[in-house]
C-alpha cells in the first residue's frame, strides 16, 4: 500500500473511532487502575563503587587492588555529579580492567544489587568491633582500635603479644608473600579522602613486608535511601469468590501514588501503537484514546468454554510465531504474563497446521533423547541447563561470568564459533576421583589367595554369582580376588598386635578377602634377628613360607603375637623364638634369625615400597588400593570400614557384570587396578583439590623475557603470558611433536635441592611419552654471574642444543660431583658431551647475562608467591608449591598421568583436527588446559537440537564477528515457566550476545485454563535509576490495565532462601478489588531475612540427631536465633542477614549431649572451635554439620521426658523482638495457642478468636501466630492488643523447605503450615499446643482441652458432626475413598486440635506426615483439604485421639440442639447456602458482635492516637 493511501486509511479509521468514543462517553477511556509492588532490602542502599570493587575481587585479588588504586578518591565526585554521571564514571574506571561482556555483567550485577550483601556483611563485622565514635575510618591492630594514622606505629609495637584476629575468606588482603606479620585491618569507605590517606600509609608498610594489610568496607553514614531489589516474581492471582472473604470494615483506597502511564506492550489486538505514534505524531492523542479503548474492550474476562480451551497453547504459539522475530519473545511475555485478558483473543487465532505437525515431531524426538514431555520447560546456556525452579538471577550472573571467562580466553587464542563449543564441552572431572594405589607390587606379602588356595576350592568362580541376592550386610563368597586388604605395619610396634588379630579374624572366618602385609623393617644391614623383633619376624616368616607355605607362616605370626605380654603389647625376639622352637623343633633358630641368615632377602623392600607410595605415618591400610582415613584406623572402626567397603564394592561389581564390562575371562586384580584413578604413588600435593592455575593467555603482551624493566610493571596474567611465550623446552624428539603435558620445574639449580629436582625430572622424561620440560630459575641469593654458573649452563644448553644432547648435558649438570667441580674452579666446557655444538654453547654461556634470572625470580615472587630459592612445579598451568619435600620421578609420572587424563588428552584430540601450526600446538594445549581447569566443575552440557526448525522455533542470530552464547529455550507459552522465562530471555538479550532458539513446546487438549494469574518478573539488564537521568522508584512490578471486576490476591515469588514480609500496603493484598479503589494499589515488601539452611547428621550412627538445637549469633550476642533439626534429611533452617555469624549448639541438652565434629560450607577451618558462617550473597547458603555424642552421654536422648534446662533464647523461627516476655525455661501452666490467618477479614476473625479464648480462661495465654502472611496493620496492632488484654505472643516464621513439594495457591500453603511443621515451629520447652482456626469463637476454658488425656496419641481432633441430616449429600467422607480408607472410623475436622509435642516429636510424627504429603502431593487432585485430609489419611500411622463432639460445633454439619453444649463454634463454609462468614458470624454467635465492637473500639482508639502523634510531629 502506498504511504499516502495508508495515511488516509489510518486517519479515516481514527476519525470514525473518535466519533464513536465520544458518543460512548469519556468514562470508556478513563485512566486505568493499577497494582504495584516493591521489594526493599532491610539494610540501606550500599555505594555502587563498593559493589564494583566486590565484582573485581571475584575476578581476582590483584584486580581488586588495581581497581582500588584508580578510584581512591572517586567518591568526591558523588557530591558534585548526578547519579547518572557518577554511575558512568564507575563503569569507565571498571572498563580499564574488564572487557565489554564483563562491563555488561557489572551493569547487571548493579541492577540486581548482587554484591550489596557483601558490603553489608563487612558493615556488620565492623559493628561487632564496634567502631570508635565519630570516625570515618579506623584500623584494628590485634584488638586495639584507632582512627588516627599517626597512632598506627605505636599500636604495632606490641601487636605480636596480642591475639591475632580471625580473617575471613572474603577479606581483601593486600598482595604480599609473607603471612606471618602483624595484621592491620582498615575499616573504611573506598573512594573517600580518609580512606586514601590510610591506604597510602598501610600499602607502603605492606609492600615493605612490615604488616599484613586487610581492607574491610565500612560506611560511617549509610545512605538514607532504601535499596530496592530485583530478581523476583510477583503474581496477581484471580481468587475464587464462591465464599465472600472481604472485610466490610474496609474503606475505599484513596492514594496519590502514580504510576507511569504506559502499557506493558505496544501491541494491542494487532495494532503496533508505538510505531503508529512515531509515524503519525500529529494523531498521538487519537491513537492513545483508541489504544485505551481497545485495552478496555480486551479486558473482558468471560469464562471460556471447554472446547475453546483445547487448542489455546497452539493458538498462542501461532500468534507468537507469526510476529516479527525480534518482537516474538516480548509477545510471549505479554501473552503469558497477562493471560487472563489475552485468553479470549487467542481463541480467535487459527492454528498453523505446519507448526502443529512440526511441534509434535520435535516433541517425540525430545522425549526420546532428553525425557522432555510436552509442556515441560528447559533453558540451556552453552549447553548448561538452567533449572528455572532453582536458578535465580544471582546464580545466572555467576554462570555468565564463568562462561565469559572461558569464552574470552578461547577467543584470545583464536577460537570462535563451533570450535569454541567443542572446548566448552570439556569438563575437568579427574579431581573427583578417590585415588588408589596400585597393589600389584612384589613387596606385598599376600597371606591368602582366593583364586588358588585350597581353602576356597568349593566356592563358585563365576562373576554371575554376584548378581544373585544375598542377606543384607553380607558379601557374596566368590573365588575371585575382588576384595583386597593391604596392611602396612612395623612388626615391633604396639599397634601391630591389633592388626594381626584383625587379619586373623578375617582369615579364620573365611571372609572373601585377600589379605596382604607390607612389613616396614629396620634397614640397617648390621641389625639382625637376634636383637630386633621385626627382623626376627621377617626371617621366621620367610623360613616357614619356604619350608611349608604362606598360610602356615601367617598362622605362626598370629601365634607369636598371642605370646606377647598383655602389659607390653610389643613383640619381642623371644616371642618369635618360642614359636619357632615349639612349632618347628628341628629348625636351627640361629640359622634362621642370626647374622648369616639366608632368609633376609628383600628385607628393605617393604620400607622402600612404603616410602614410594607416599602414604602418611604408620600404620596404614588399603582396601583395593584405597587408603583408609586416619579416623578409620582405630581397630574397631577399621573392621566395620572394611566390611562396608566390601559391600559398596559388591554393588559396583554387580553393575559392571550387568553391563558386561566384567566377565569370567577378566583378571580380577587387573580389572581393579587398570582403572583411571589407580596411581603408583599417593602425593597429597598433586592430588589435593584446591588448585591454583596460571592464566597464560594475553592479547597484547610483546615484552621479552630479558626486558626486566618492562616485565616489572606487568600484571600477573601478562607476566605469566610472557614466561610462557619465551619458554624453551626439552622434548622427546627434535622433530615437531605435540606434547599434551607441559611441565615447568622451578628451583635454584645452583643448589643441591634444585639439581635433585632437575635429576628426577630428567629421569621421568626418559620414559615419558606425553610431556615436555621447561625450566624456571628462582635463585636463592642476589643474582650475579658467579652464583648462577649452573643455571647459566642450563639456559645456554636450552638455547643452543638439540634434544638428545640437551638431555644428556642437563643430566651431567644435575650430578653433585660435577657441580662441585665447577664451583671449585673447573670450566663448564670441560663437561660438555660428545656431539654438542660446543662453539654455540660457549658463546651463549659467556654472553647470556642474568636479566632472565631476575625476570624469572620476579615471576616466582609476584605470581607464584615463592620466596627466593623455593621450589615448585607447573603442569599445564597448574602450580604446585612450594615443595617441602623431595619430588620423585614417580611423582612426575603421577602428575603427568593426571594432567593427561584430566583434559590434556581430550584437548590434544580436538587440536589435532584444527590445522594449528604444530610448533604452537603444545603451547595451545597448555593454555587451554590451564583456562578450562581453572573453572570450578560444571554440570554436564547437553547438545540440544531440533529435528525441524521452520515453523515451531524462534531463531535470532548473534551479532557477527563477536563471540556469542548459545541459548536453547523450550517452553509452552502458556505456563508459569513461560511467564518467568520470557522476561529472562529479554534481559539476557541485552546483556550478552546470544544465538537463541526458542521451541514452542505446546500441550494439546487443555481441559482447564492453563494460567489463572497475571505475573511480572522484576529483572532488568541494568539499574533503572542511575543508568539514566530519569528519577525512578527503582525496580518495581507494575500491573497496568488490570480488569476491575475479579477479586485478586498478590503473591511474592522470591528466590529460595529469602524471607520477605509486607511492610506497607494501602489495601488488603489478599483481597484486591479494583472496583473499590480510586487509582493505584501499592504494596511494599521487605527482605526480612536471608535463610541459612543445613543438614546435620550424627557421625557415628549416620542418622539425623532429632531435636538437636543450634544457635546463631555473634561474639557479643551468642544466641540471636536458634532452630531444631528435623529427622527428615537432618534439615534445619536459621534466619539471618548479611554478616559473619557463629554457629553453636544450643545451651542445655544439645550442648551437654553432643559436640560438633565436622562441617562443610562454613567459613572456618574444621579444627576451629567456633564455626564461622558468612552470609555475603543473596544466594542460598547450605551447611553440612556432623555431630557426635559425648562419650558419657551415648545412651541419652534430647527428646526424653526430662525438663529441658535451656538458657538460650528461642528465636529461630520467630521474629527477633516481637515477644513481650521471653522465657528461658518451661512454664507448666500456660495455654499455648497456635493460629494462622491471611487477609484482613481473617485477621479480624483472629483478633475476635483471641479475645474469646482470653474471656473464657484464667490461665496465662501465649499465642503463636504464623507471621508469613500477616498484614502490616495486624503486626502493628498486636503489641497494643497484648498490652491491653495481658497475653503474650510470638510471631513464628518458617520457609517451606525446598526439598518438600511446593504448593502455589495461598490457601493450600497456609493449610500446609498448619500440619507439616509442628515439630519445628515451637521450642522444645512447649509441651502442648492447641491449634484454633481464626474464624472460631471459644466458649469454654481451653485449659480443659490442654489437659485432656490423649491416650498415647500425639494429637487429638474433633470428628465431623453427623447430626444435621439435610447436609448428608455433602458429607464426602461417607462415600468413595474415605469410606473405604476409614472403615468405621471418624473423619476429623482440622479447625481445632491439640498436639502433645513431646510425643509428636518422639515418634517422628512430623517426618511421617511430610513423607506421606510428599508422596500424595504428586497427584494434584489428592489432598484437596490438605490440613485435614493428611492427618486423616495417616490415621493408621499417626494415631488421632477423637475429642468429644462438644469441643467443636459448626452449623453446617451439627444440628441446632447440640449448639447449647458447644465449647467452640467454628464458622465452617456452607456448600449449600454459600453464606458469607461475616453474615454467618453475626447470625450464629451473638457474642461475636460484642467482641467485634470491642476490638473495633480499641483499633479506633489506636488510630486516633496515631493521628494525634502525626499532627503533633507536623506542628513541631
UniProtKB/Swiss-Prot annotation:
* PTM-bearing positions, type Phosphotyrosine: 1289
Which Pfam family, any one, appears in the UniProt record? Thioredoxin_14
Pathway in which this enzyme or protein is active: Protein modification; protein glycosylation
**Which key words are in the record?**
Endoplasmic reticulum, Glycoprotein, Glycosyltransferase, Phosphoprotein, Signal, Transferase
Major subcellular location class: endoplasmic reticulum
InterPro entries from the UniProt entry: Glyco_transf_24 (IPR040497), Nucleotide-diphossugar_trans (IPR029044), UDP-g_GGtrans (IPR009448), UGGT_TRXL_1 (IPR040693), UGGT_TRXL_2 (IPR040694), UGGT_TRXL_3 (IPR040692), UGGT_TRXL_4 (IPR040525)
The reactions it catalyses are: N(4)-(alpha-D-Man-(1->2)-alpha-D-Man-(1->2)-alpha-D-Man-(1->3)-[alpha-D-Man-(1->2)-alpha-D-Man-(1->3)-[alpha-D-Man-(1->2)-alpha-D-Man-(1->6)]-alpha-D-Man-(1->6)]-beta-D-Man-(1->4)-beta-D-GlcNAc-(1->4)-beta-D-GlcNAc)-L-asparaginyl-[protein] (N-glucan mannose isomer 9A1,2,3B1,2,3) + UDP-alpha-D-glucose = N(4)-(alpha-D-Glc-(1->3)-alpha-D-Man-(1->2)-alpha-D-Man-(1->2)-alpha-D-Man-(1->3)-[alpha-D-Man-(1->2)-alpha-D-Man-(1->3)-[alpha-D-Man-(1->2)-alpha-D-Man-(1->6)]-alpha-D-Man-(1->6)]-beta-D-Man-(1->4)-beta-D-GlcNAc-(1->4)-beta-D-GlcNAc)-L-asparaginyl-[protein] + UDP + H(+)
Q: Which residues are glycosylated?
A: 256, 286, 920, 950
Q: What is its EC number?
A: 2.4.1.-
Q: Which GO terms describe its cellular component?
A: endoplasmic reticulum; endoplasmic reticulum lumen; endoplasmic reticulum quality control compartment; endoplasmic reticulum-Golgi intermediate compartment; protein-containing complex
Instruction: Describe, from its UniProt entry, the tissues in which this protein is expressed.
Output: Higher levels in kidney, pancreas, heart, and skeletal muscle.
Q: What class of enzyme is it?
A: transferase
Residue positions of motif Prevents secretion from ER = 1513-1516
Entry's localization field: Endoplasmic reticulum lumen; Endoplasmic reticulum-Golgi intermediate compartment
The positions making up the signal sequence are 1-27
Query: Which residue intervals make up region (Glucosyltransferase)?
Result: 1220-1516
Cofactor(s) this protein cannot do without: Ca(2+); Mn(2+)
SUPFAM superfamilies with a match to the protein in the record: Nucleotide-diphospho-sugar transferases
**Listed GO biological process terms:** endoplasmic reticulum mannose trimming; protein N-linked glycosylation via asparagine
Q: What do we know about how this protein assembles, alone or with others?
A: Interacts with METTL23. Interacts with SELENOF.
Function (record text): Recognizes glycoproteins with minor folding defects. Reglucosylates single N-glycans near the misfolded part of the protein, thus providing quality control for protein folding in the endoplasmic reticulum. Reglucosylated proteins are recognized by calreticulin for recycling to the endoplasmic reticulum and refolding or degradation.
Which family does this protein fall into?
Belongs to the glycosyltransferase 8 family.
- This protein's name: UDP-glucose:glycoprotein glucosyltransferase 2
Q: Which organism is it from?
A: Homo sapiens
Amino acid at each position: 500500500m502506498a504511504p499516502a493511501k495508508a495515511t488516509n486509511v489510518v486517519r479515516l479509521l481514527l476519525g470514525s473511532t473518535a466519533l464513536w468514543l465520544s458518543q460512548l462517553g469519556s468514562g470508556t477511556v478513563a485512566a486505568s487502575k493499577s497494582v504495584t509492588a516493591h521489594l526493599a532490602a532491610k539494610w540501606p542502599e550500599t555505594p555502587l563503587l563498593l559493589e564494583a570493587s566486590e565484582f573485581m575481587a571475584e575476578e581476582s585479588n590483584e584486580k581488586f587492588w588495581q581497581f582500588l588504586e584508580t578510584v581512591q578518591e572517586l567518591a568526591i565526585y558523588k557530591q558534585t555529579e548526578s547519579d547518572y554521571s557518577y554511575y558512568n564514571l564507575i563503569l569507565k574506571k571498571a572498563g580499564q580492567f574488564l572487557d565489554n561482556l564483563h562491563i555488561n555483567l557489572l551493569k547487571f550485577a548493579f541492577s540486581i544489587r548482587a554484591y550489596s550483601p557483601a558490603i553489608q556483611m563487612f558493615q556488620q563485622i565492623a559493628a561487632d568491633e564496634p567502631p570508635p565514635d565519630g570516625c570515618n575510618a579506623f584500623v584494628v591492630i590485634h584488638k586495639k582500635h584507632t582512627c588516627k594514622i599517626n597512632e598506627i606505629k605505636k599500636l604495632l609495637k606490641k601487636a605480636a603479644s596480642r591475639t591475632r584476629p580471625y580473617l575471613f575468606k572474603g577479606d581483601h588482603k593486600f598482595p604480599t608473600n609473607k603471612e606471618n606479620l602483624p595484621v592491620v585491618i582498615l575499616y573504611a569507605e573506598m573512594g573517600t579522602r580518609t580512606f586514601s590517606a590510610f591506604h597510602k600509609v598501610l600499602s607502603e608498610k605492606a609492600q615493605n613486608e612490615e604488616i599484613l594489610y586487610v581492607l574491610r568496607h565500612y560506611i560511617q553514614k549509610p545512605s538514607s535511601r532504601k535499596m530496592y531489589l530485583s530478581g523476583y516474581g510477583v503474581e496477581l492471582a484471580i481468587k475464587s469468590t464462591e465464599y465472600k472473604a472481604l472485610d466490610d470494615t474496609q474503606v475505599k483506597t484513596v492514594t496519590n501514588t502514580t504510576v507511569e502511564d504506559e502499557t506493558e506492550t505496544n501491541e494491542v489486538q494487532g495494532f503496533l501503537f508505538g510505531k503508529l505514534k512515531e509515524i503519525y505524531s500529529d494523531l498521538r492523542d487519537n491513537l492513545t484514546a483508541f489504544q485505551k479503548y481497545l485495552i478496555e474492550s480486551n479486558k473482558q474476562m468471560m469464562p471460556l468454554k471447554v472446547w475453546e480451551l483445547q487448542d489455546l497453547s497452539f493458538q498462542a504459539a501461532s500468534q507468537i510465531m507469526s510476529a516479527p522475530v525480534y518482537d516474538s519473545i516480548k509477545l510471549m511475555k505479554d501473552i503469558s504474563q497477562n493471560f487472563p485478558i489475552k485468553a479470549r483473543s487467542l481463541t480467535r487465532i487459527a492454528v498453523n497446521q505446519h507448526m502443529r505437525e512440526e511441534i509434535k515431531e520435535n516433541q517425540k524426538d525430545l522425549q526420546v533423547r532428553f525425557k522432555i514431555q510436552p509442556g515441560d520447560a528447559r533453558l540451556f546456556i552453552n549447553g548448561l541447563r538452567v533449572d528455572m525452579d532453582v536458578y535465580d538471577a544471582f546464580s545466572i550472573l555467576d554462570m555468565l561470568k564463568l562462561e565469559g571467562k572461558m569464552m574470552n580466553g578461547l577467543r584470545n587464542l583464536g577460537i570462535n564459533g563451533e570450535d569454541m563449543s567443542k572446548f566448552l564441552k570439556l569438563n575437568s572431572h579427574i579431581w573427583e576421583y578417590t585415588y588408589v594405589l596400585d597393589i600389584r607390587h612384589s613387596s606385598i606379602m599376600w597371606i591368602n589367595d582366593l583364586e588358588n588356595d585350597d581353602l576356597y576350592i568349593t566356592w563358585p568362580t563365576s562373576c554371575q554369582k554376584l548378581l544373585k541376592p544375598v542377606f543384607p550386610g553380607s558379601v557374596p563368597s566368590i573365588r575371585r580376588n575382588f576384595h583386597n586388604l593391604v596392611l602396612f605395619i612395623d612388626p615391633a610396634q604396639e599397634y601391630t598386635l591389633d592388626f594381626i588379630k584383625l587379619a586373623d579374624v578375617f582369615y579364620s572366618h573365611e571372609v572373601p578377602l585377600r589379605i596382604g602385609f607390607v612389613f616396614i623393617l629396620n634397614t640397617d644391614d648390621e641389625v639382625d634377628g637376634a636383637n630386633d623383633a621385626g627382623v626376627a619376624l621377617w626371617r621366621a616368616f620367610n623360613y616357614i613360607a619356604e619350608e611349608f607355605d604362606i598360610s602356615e607362616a601367617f598362622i605362626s605370626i598370629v601365634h607369636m603375637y598371642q605370646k606377647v605380654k598383655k602389659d607390653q603389647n610389643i613383640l619381642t625376639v623371644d616371642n618369635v623364638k618360642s614359636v619357632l622352637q615349639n612349632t618347628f623343633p628341628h629348625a636351627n633358630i640361629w640359622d634362621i634369625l642370626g647374622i648369616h641368615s639366608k632368609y633376609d632377602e628383600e628385607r628393605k623392600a617393604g620400607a622402600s615400597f612404603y616410602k614410594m607410595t607416599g602414604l602418611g605415618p604408620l600404620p596404614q591400610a588399603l582396601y583395593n588400593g584405597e587408603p583408609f582415613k586416619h579416623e578409620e584406623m582405630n581397630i574397631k572402626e577399621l573392621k566395620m570400614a572394611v566390611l562396608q567397603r566390601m559391600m559398596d564394592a559388591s554393588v559396583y561389581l554387580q553393575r559392571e557384570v550387568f553391563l558386561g564390562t566384567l566377565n569370567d575371562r577378566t583378571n580380577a586384580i587387573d580389572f581393579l587396578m587398570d582403572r583411571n584413578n589407580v596411581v603408583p604413588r599417593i602425593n597429597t600435593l598433586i592430588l589435593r583439590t584446591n588448585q591454583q592455575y596460571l592464566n597464560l593467555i594475553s592479547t597484547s603482551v610483546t615484552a621479552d623475557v630479558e626486558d626486566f624493566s618492562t616485565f616489572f610493571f606487568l600484571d600477573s596474567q601478562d607476566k605469566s603470558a610472557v614466561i610462557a611465550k619465551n619458554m624453551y623446552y626439552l622434548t622427546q624428539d627434535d622433530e615437531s611433536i605435540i606434547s599434551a603435558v607441559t611441565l615447568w620445574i622451578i628451583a635454584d639449580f645452583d643448589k643441591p635441592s634444585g639439581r635433585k629436582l632437575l635429576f628426577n625430572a630428567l629421569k621421568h622424561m626418559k620414559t615419558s611419552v606425553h610431556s615436555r620440560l621447561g625450566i624456571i630459575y628462582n635463585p636463592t641469593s642476589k643474582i650475579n654471574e658467579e652464583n648462577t654458573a649452573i643455571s647459566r649452563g642450563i639456559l645456554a644448553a636450552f638455547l643452543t642444543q638439540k634434544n638428545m644432547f640437551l638431555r644428556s648435558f642437563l643430566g651431567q649438570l644435575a650430578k653433585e660431583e660435577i657441580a662441585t667441580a665447577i664451583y671449585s674452579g673447573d670450566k663448564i666446557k670441560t663437561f660438555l658431551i660428545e656431539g654438542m655444538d660446543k662453539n654455540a654453547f660457549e658463546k651463549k654461556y659467556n654472553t647470556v647475562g642474568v636479566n632472565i634470572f631476575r625476570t624469572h625470580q620476579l615471576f616466582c615472587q609476584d605470581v607464584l608467591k615463592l620466596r627466593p630459592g623455593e621450589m615448585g612445579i607447573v603442569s599445564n598451568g597448574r602450580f604446585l608449591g612450594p615443595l617441602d619435600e623431595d619430588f620423585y620421578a614417580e611423582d612426575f609420572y603421577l602428575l603427568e598421568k593426571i594432567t593427561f587424563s584430566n583434559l590434556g588428552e581430550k584437548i590434544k584430540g580436538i587440536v589435532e583436527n584444527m590445522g594449528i601450526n604444530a610448533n604452537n600446538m603444545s603451547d595451545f594445549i597448555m593454555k587451554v588446559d590451564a583456562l578450562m581447569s581453572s573453572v570450578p566443575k560444571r554440570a554436564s552440557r547437553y547438545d540440544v537440537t531440533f529435528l525441524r526448525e521452520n515453523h515451531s522455533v524462534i531463531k535470532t542470530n548473534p551479532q557477527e564477528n563477536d563471540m556469542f552464547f548459545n541459548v536453547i529455550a523450550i517452553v509452552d507459552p502458556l505456563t508459569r515457566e513461560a511467564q518467568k522465562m520470557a522476561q529472562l530471555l529479554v534481559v539476557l538479550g541485552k546483556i550478552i550476545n546470544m544465538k537463541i532458539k526458542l521451541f514452542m513446546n505446546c500441550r494439546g487438549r487443555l481441559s482447564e485454563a492453563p494460567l489463572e494469574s497475571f505475573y511480572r518478573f522484576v529483572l532488568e539488564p541494568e539499574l533503572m535509576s542511575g543508568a539514566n537521568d530519569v528519577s525512578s522508584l527503582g525496580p518495581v512490578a507494575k500491573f497496568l490495565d488490570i480488569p476491575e471486576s475479579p477479586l485478586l490476591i498478590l503473591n511474592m515469588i522470591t528466590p529460595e532462601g529469602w524471607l520477605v514480609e509486607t511492610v506497607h500496603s494501602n489495601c488488603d493484598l489478599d483481597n484486591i478489588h479494583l472496583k473499590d479503589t480510586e487509582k493505584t494499589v501499592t504494596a511494599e515488601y521487605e527482605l526480612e531475612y536471608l535463610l541459612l539452611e543445613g543438614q546435620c547428621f550424627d557421625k557415628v550412627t549416620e542418622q539425623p540427631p532429632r531435636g538437636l538445637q543450634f544457635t546463631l549469633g555473634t561474639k557479643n550476642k551468642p544466641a540471636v536465633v536458634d532452630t531444631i533439626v528435623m529427622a527428615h534429611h537432618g534439615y534445619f533452617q536459621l534466619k539471618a542477614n548479611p554478616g559473619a555469624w557463629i554457629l553453636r549448639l544450643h545451651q542445655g541438652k544439645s550442648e551437654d549431649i553432643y559436640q560438633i565434629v565436622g562441617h562443610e560450607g562454613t567459613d572456618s577451618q574444621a579444627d576451629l572451635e567456633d564455626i564461622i558462617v558468612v552470609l555475603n550473597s543473596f544466594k542460598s547458603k547450605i551447611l553440612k554439620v556432623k555431630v557426635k555424642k559425648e562419650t558419657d552421654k551415648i545412651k541419652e536422648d534430647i527428646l526424653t521426658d526430662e525438663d529441658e534446662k535451656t538458657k538460650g533464647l528461642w528465636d529461630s523461627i520467630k521474629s527477633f523482638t516481637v515477644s513481650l516476655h521471653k522465657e528461658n525455661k518451661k512454664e507448666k501452666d500456660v495455654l499455648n495457642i497456635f493460629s494462622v490467618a491471611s487477609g484482613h477479614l481473617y485477621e479480624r476473625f483472629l483478633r475476635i478468636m483471641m479475645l474469646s479464648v482470653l474471656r473464657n480462661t484464667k490461665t496465662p495465654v501465649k499465642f503463636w501466630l504464623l507471621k508469613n502472611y500477616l498484614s502490616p496493620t495486624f503486626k502493628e496492632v498486636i503489641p497494643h492488643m497484648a498490652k491491653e488484654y495481658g497475653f503474650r505472643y510470638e510471631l513464628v516464621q518458617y520457609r517451606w523447605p525446598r526439598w518438600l513439594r511446593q504448593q502455589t495457591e495461598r490457601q493450600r500453603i497456609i493449610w500446609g503450615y498448619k500440619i507439616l511443621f509442628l515439630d519445628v515451629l515451637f521450642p522444645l520447652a512447649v509441651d502442648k499446643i492447641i491449634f484454633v482456626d481464626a474464624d472460631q469463637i471459644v466458649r469454654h476454658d481451653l485449659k480443659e482441652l490442654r489437659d485432656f488425656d490423649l491416650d498415647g496419641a500425639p494429637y487429638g481432633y474433633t470428628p465431623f458432626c453427623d447430626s444435621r441430616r439435610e447436609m448428608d449429600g455433602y458429607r464426602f467422607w461417607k462415600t468413595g475413598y474415605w469410606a473405604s480408607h476409614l472403615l468405621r472410623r471418624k473423619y476429623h475436622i482440622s479447625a481445632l486440635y491439640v498436639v502433645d509435642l513431646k510425643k509428636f516429636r518422639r515418634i517422628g510424627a512430623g517426618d511421617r506426615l511430610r513423607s506421606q504429603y510428599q508422596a500424595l502431593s504428586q497427584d494434584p487432585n489428592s489432598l484437596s483439604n490438605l490440613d485435614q485430609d493428611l492427618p486423616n489419611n495417616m490415621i493408621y500411622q499417626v494415631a488421632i485421639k477423637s475429642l468429644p463432639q462438644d469441643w467443636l460445633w459448626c452449623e453446617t454439619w451439627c444440628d441446632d440442639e447440640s449448639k447449647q453444649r458447644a465449647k467452640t463454634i467454628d464458622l465452617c463454609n456452607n456448600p449449600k447456602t454459600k453464606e458469607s462468614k461475616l453474615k454467618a458470624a453475626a447470625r450464629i454467635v451473638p457474642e461475636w458482635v460484642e467482641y467485634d465492637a470491642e476490638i473495633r473500639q480499641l483499633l479506633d482508639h489506636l488510630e486516633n492516637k496515631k493521628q494525634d502523634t502525626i499532627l503533633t510531629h507536623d506542628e513541631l
